[in-house]
Amino acid sequence: MVSVSEIRQAQRAEGPATIMAIGTANPANCVEQSTYPDFYFKITNSEHKVELKEKFQRMCDKSMIKRRYMYLTEEILKENPSVCEYMAPSLDARQDMVVVEVPRLGKEAAVKAIKEWGQPKSKITHLIFCTTSGVDMPGADYQLTKLLGLRPYVKRYMMYQQGCFAGGTVLRLAKDLAENNKGARVLVVCSEVTAVTFRGPSDTHLDSLVGQALFGDGAAALIVGSDPIPEIEKPIFEMVWTAQTIAPDSEGAIDGHLREAGLTFHLLKDVPGIVSKNIDKALVEAFQPLNISDYNSIFWIAHPGGPAILDQVEQKLGLKPEKMKATREVLSEYGNMSSACVLFILDEMRKKSAQAGLKTTGEGLDWGVLFGFGPGLTIETVVLHSVAI
């Protein structure tokens, strides 16, 4: 008779979880940051708020963002005036948009990832879908299964309302699934649409205005599995270790609340300080077992919640400016896409590493770290090992 331990052994993969493909997608509507304050105050009928507009212009100028992509066009916003007001009841209108657009944008990214992977979609065993945009039953995971034509017995995990740290969460979950289920191939999708958070400006809620200056729409998809099939599946990054922690004394630092007026966003001024104060401890826990204490010797992927967070992390750790190059590039070209951001940065890094003729997918380095920061304040840490190009 076979023992339980023998069964468990047979169920486990041999090697580490590996990212085998990455795909990204954005809505067609591209918004230039330099002209966005004019558009935003006009479409929300707020042009009479001259001082507030000047303040918003300064926020946009300091954001280090050149452009963003948004599902919400001028036409859609004119058809839905309640979405343009500051706190008008508008949840139904927002939900009607995102329950369709979130899985649709997710499909676009997933199709690209599956194509790069090069295997038939029938070999996908698990699906992890993550969004902070809207809630529905059956969920966006179900809708994507239908849109892609996945097998009905794909094992699905739906993560709603997690916020900006969740790009790290999906990697942590995908790692555990791939390593504990031999032959598993996990499709990971993060799809974010700002139709839930868009609203007009308010003199009394400036943190909402910060969100209006930063957030953009995007979806990213990965294929994750252990023991890549030689000559068929090409590894990009290996996931070696993961952790999640709540930063001490950080309650209320980042909050989001789903209300009749949509998803409201609340932010304390000291978020960059809280992140930078706690990042050293997270790094020691992650890299001490590898005997790494020089954080300039690893590659960096950090959720770009905003430029101030990146600046303070660099300053606290004495990081060279080029360490955050891929992160800042994604912030500049797409804005803060919540959970999808770090997956976009993975894609940016492996592409630029290949273009520059470097020896690994991680800017020529062997080891790297991926950080997610979000409500809680929650910090996700993923230790990555690059692959030879």
From Swiss-Prot:
Summarize the protein's role: The primary product of this enzyme is 4,2',4',6'-tetrahydroxychalcone (also termed naringenin-chalcone or chalcone) which can under specific conditions spontaneously isomerize into naringenin.
According to UniProt, the name of this protein is Chalcone synthase 9
List the catalytic activities from the record: (E)-4-coumaroyl-CoA + 3 malonyl-CoA + 3 H(+) = 2',4,4',6'-tetrahydroxychalcone + 3 CO2 + 4 CoA
Is Acyltransferase among the key words of this record?
yes
Tell me which EC number(s) this protein carries.
2.3.1.74
Domain of life the protein comes from: Eukaryota
The record, for PANTHER family, names: CHALCONE SYNTHASE 7, HYDROXYMETHYLGLUTARYL-COA SYNTHASE
Q: Identify its protein family.
A: Belongs to the thiolase-like superfamily. Chalcone/stilbene synthases family.
| Residues annotated as catalytic | 164
* Statement: the UniProt record of this protein carries the keyword Translocase: no
Signal peptide range equals none
Alphabetically ordered keywords of this record:
Acyltransferase, Flavonoid biosynthesis, Transferase
**Matching InterPro entries, A to Z?**
Chalcone/stilbene_synt_C, Chalcone/stilbene_synt_N, Chalcone/stilbene_synthase_AS, Polyketide_synthase_type-III, Thiolase-like
- Native organism: Medicago sativa
Pathway assigned in UniProt:
Secondary metabolite biosynthesis; flavonoid biosynthesis
Listed GO biological process terms: flavonoid biosynthetic process; polyketide biosynthetic process
Gene3D superfamilies for this protein: 3.40.47.10
Mind listing the GO molecular function terms for this protein? naringenin-chalcone synthase activity
